């Protein structure tokens, strides 16, 4: 039985939506009870996986048919013509389109970064918190397109703090057979004189509280500390 909403709305919402009371209380203070409930409801709503089609290298129709042939449900994602929302499959690693490097798992919000960055031929680009590499890989591909007919070639350096995270980036680079991007283990808080005033574009998706991704990573809500 749920707690009484009238007697204790924080407790009610906490139990109803499986969210620590500390967070519920803070959000009610910030946003009010009605908006907080909408936020909590959204966290429990199943989200589709979004993939980026590498349609500069593979015909998008070919990618679509490969997914459908394996029983995947495919719908266009908003904003970008090369993005699909996919569902009705067991594991991304079992999909031929993924194995063959034709698609990359990536949120539309992440894809928009490369669109806004709009790299130009010969650009030097560094991503200081890159793992698993979605934005770095995407911008490397857009850079490759602009570089194709140019003598001066650009490069992307994808960095992260641990060898494990760098390994994730390297796996994706290898799967997608990209040559204008490399991964480096480096602490973003340490000055790097070698790159001082040399980068044309710097990507910095910095570590944060993770409060906005509880829907995808529900375990985080039990690790958040009040401070």
Annotated model-derived regions:
Residues 1-227:
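S-adenosylmethionine
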């Amino acid at each position: 039985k749920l707690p009484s909403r009238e007697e204790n709305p924080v407790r009610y919402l906490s139990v109803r939506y499986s969210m620590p009371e500390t967070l519920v209380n803070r959000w009610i203070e910030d946003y009010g009870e009605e908006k907080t409930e909408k936020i909590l409801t959204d966290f429990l709503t199943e989200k589709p996986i979004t993939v980026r089609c590498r349609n500069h290298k593979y015909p998008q129709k070919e990618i679509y048919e490969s997914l459908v042939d394996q029983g995947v449900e495919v719908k266009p994602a908003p904003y970008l013509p090369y993005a699909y929302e996919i569902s009705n499959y067991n594991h991304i690693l079992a999909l031929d389109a993924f194995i063959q490097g034709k698609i990359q798992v990536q949120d539309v919000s992440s894809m928009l970064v490369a669109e806004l960055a709009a790299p130009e031929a010969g650009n030097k680009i560094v991503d200081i918190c890159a793992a698993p590499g979605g934005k770095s890989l995407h911008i490397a591909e857009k850079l490759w397109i602009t570089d194709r007919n140019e003598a001066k070639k650009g490069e992307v350096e994808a960095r992260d703090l641990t060898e494990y995270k760098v390994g994730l980036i390297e796996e994706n680079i290898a799967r997608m057979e990209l040559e204008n991007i490399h991964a480096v283990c480096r602490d973003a808080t340490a000055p790097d004189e070698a790159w001082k005033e040399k980068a044309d574009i710097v990507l910095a998706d910095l570590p944060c509280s993770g409060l906005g991704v509880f829907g995808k990573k529900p375990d985080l809500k039990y690790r958040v500390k009040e401070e």
